């Protein structure tokens, strides 16, 4: 991902304030509610029958945290996202057979959640930088697909 020094600074300074537990669960939960077909990858998560069930599901929250911890690793390696996400790309492609389009959806949902959490601090410039990052991460995760 090609970010200016200003964009990198905006992304990293905001990310330092992110509560990964809270935002991760909310982002994954919203993905599962807004795009219900994504639930098929989470059969083992139990009750996902209503928005409240999804948002309160401890497995959704735990996996959301895991997803954002990986995203944090990506932020530390913006110049090598494909390398950073190579193993996860392989896992999601070969073993889990996740539609790579879902990575883009989750990235966009994450941007919405960050906007919701940070309000005025999430300026259009910050959003533009985050859109570049989530697109880069989605692209890196889709890299191993044939």
Curated annotation (Swiss-Prot):
The keyword Kinase does not apply. Heme b binds at residues 63, 92. GO terms for cellular component: blood microparticle; haptoglobin-hemoglobin complex; hemoglobin complex. CDD domains: Hb-beta-like (cd08925). The modification Phosphothreonine is found at residue 12. GO terms for molecular function: haptoglobin binding; heme binding; hemoglobin alpha binding; metal ion binding; organic acid binding; oxygen binding; oxygen carrier activity; peroxidase activity. Residues 2-146 form the Globin domain. One of its GO terms (biological process) is hydrogen peroxide catabolic process. It comes from the Eukaryota. Red blood cells. The modification N-acetylvaline is found at residue 1. Keywords: Acetylation, Heme, Iron, Metal-binding, Oxygen transport, Phosphoprotein, S-nitrosylation, Transport. The modification S-nitrosocysteine is found at residue 93. The modification N6-acetyllysine is found at residues 59, 82, 144. SUPFAM superfamilies: Globin-like. The modification Phosphoserine is found at residue 44. InterPro entries: Globin, Globin-like_sf, Globin/Proto, Hemoglobin_b, Hemoglobin_oxygen_transport. Belongs to the globin family. Heterotetramer of two alpha chains and two beta chains. PANTHER family: HEMOGLOBIN FAMILY MEMBER, HEMOGLOBIN SUBUNIT BETA. Involved in oxygen transport from the lung to the various peripheral tissues. This is Hemoglobin subunit beta. It comes from Meles meles. The lineage of its organism: Eukaryota, Metazoa, Chordata, Craniata, Vertebrata. The gene is HBB.
């Amino acid at each position: 991902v090609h970010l200016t020094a200003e964009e990198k600074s905006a992304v990293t300074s905001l990310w330092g304030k992110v509560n990964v537990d809270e935002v991760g669960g909310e982002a994954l939960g919203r993905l599962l509610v807004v795009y219900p077909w994504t639930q098929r990858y989470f059969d083992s998560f139990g009750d996902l029958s209503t928005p409240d069930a999804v948002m309160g599901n401890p497995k959704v929250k735990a996996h959301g945290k895991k997803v954002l911890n990986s995203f944090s690793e990506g932020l530390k390696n913006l110049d090598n996202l494909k390398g950073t996400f190579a193993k996860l790309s392989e896992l999601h492609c070969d073993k889990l057979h996740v539609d790579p389009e879902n990575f883009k959806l989750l990235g966009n949902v994450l941007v919405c959640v960050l906007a919701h959490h940070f309000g005025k601090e999430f300026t259009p410039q910050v959003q533009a930088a985050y859109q570049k990052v989530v697109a880069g991460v989605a692209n890196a995760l889709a890299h191993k697909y044939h």
